[in-house]
């Protein structure tokens, strides 16, 4: 997990 991602509304690595 990187941080909270608003694009998928989950804790992941979205958009680097």
From Swiss-Prot:
It is found in: Secreted. The keyword Ribonucleoprotein does not apply. Disulfide bonds join 1-13, 2-11, 7-14. The keyword Phosphoprotein does not apply. Keywords: Disulfide bond, Secreted, Toxin. The cysteine framework is III (CC-C-C-CC). Belongs to the conotoxin M superfamily. This is Conotoxin ar3b. It comes from Conus araneosus. The lineage of its organism: Eukaryota, Metazoa, Spiralia, Lophotrochozoa, Mollusca.
């Amino acid at each position: 997990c990187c941080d909270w991602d608003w694009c998928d509304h989950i804790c992941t690595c979205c958009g680097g």
